[in-house]
Amino acid sequence: MDLILLVGIAIALLVILITLYFLQNKNSKTETKAAAQPQRGVPQRAQEGVPRRAQIARNQRNRLRANQNAPAAAAAAAAPAAAAIDTDNDEAAAAGDENGPRVPQGAVLDEKMGAKKRAKMEAKEQKRLQREQELHDREQRKVKEAKEDAERKQQEELEAEVERKRVEAERLAKEEREHKEHEEYLKMKAAFSIEEEGFEEGDADEKESLLADFIQYIKDNKVVLLEDLATAFKLKTQQAIERIQELQANGTITGVIDDRGKFIYVSEAELAAVAKFIKQRGRVSIADLAESSNKLINLTPVATGEGSVQ
C-alpha cells in the first residue's frame, strides 16, 4: 500500500512538470510568431517582443508566486513519503526489539541527523543511564545500611538482655546470701541465749566470757581440729562447726574448714597481705599462690596447751 502511494505521488509530480513544460513552450512559440509578423499600428517595442513594464511586473509576480507555491507543493507531496518512511522505521525498530538489543529510550537517531546532533543525543542518553545507575546504587546502599542497622540493633538488644539477666542474677544471689547470713546470725544469737549441753547456767557475763574464750582459742591455735575444739568446750562436733559458721557469717573470725575436719584461721591482716600479693602480681597460678600463702599466712600456734592441735 505504501509503495503504491509513493508511485502515485511521483506520477502526479511528473504530470505537473510535463504540463508546465508544454505551457511554457506554447507561450514561447506564440511570442515568436507575433514578433515575426509586424502589425500596423503596433508599436515597434511590442513588435520586437520587448514586454511592457506592466507585463514585466506581472511576470515577476507570477514567478514569485510559483516559487512560493513550489516548496509547499513539494512538502505536501513529500509528507506521505516521509510518513511511509517513518512507518517502515517503526516496523524495523519493533523487529529489532524482538530479534536484537533494545534501542535505549530517548535515543531516536534519524539517518539524516547530523553527526553533531547525534553525538549530543548520545551524550544525553549516556548521562540519563548514568543517573539511573547512580540512583540504583544509592537505593542498594540504603537497603544494605538499613539491614546492617537492624542487625546491629538486634545484637545490642541481645547484649543488653544478657547484661540485664546477669545483673538480676547477681542481685538475687546477693539478697540470698545476705538473707542466709542474717538467718545464721539469728541462729547464733539464739544458740548463745539458751542453755546448751556442756555449758552451765550463768549470767550474761559468763556467756560472753565463754564466747570470747571460744574465739580466742581458735585464734591462738590457728589450725584447730574440730573434734578437739568440741571436746575443749564440752560440745558436740556439729555444734562446734555451727558456731564457727555463725562467727564467720557475722565477720567475727575468718578462715576455712577443710575436708580433713580442721578449721584454719586466717586473720584480716593476712587476708589483706594475700590480696595485695595477687593485685601486684596480676595473674597468679595456684602453685605460686600456695607458695606465697605459706609465707604470708602464719599457721604456727600462739600458745599450746591441752586443746592444741596434734
Curated annotation (Swiss-Prot):
Sequence intervals crossing the membrane: 3-23
Subunit structure: Interacts with Atg9; the interaction is transient.
Biased composition (Basic and acidic residues): 109-157
Membrane is among the record's keywords: yes
GO molecular function: ubiquitin-like protein ligase binding
Gene3D superfamilies for this protein: Winged helix-like DNA-binding domain superfamily/Winged helix DNA-binding domain
Cytoplasmic side: 24-310
Provenance organism: Drosophila mojavensis
Gene name linked to the record: Ddrgk1
Keyword presence, Membrane: yes
Gene Ontology CC, one term: endoplasmic reticulum membrane
Name used for this protein in its record: DDRGK domain-containing protein 1
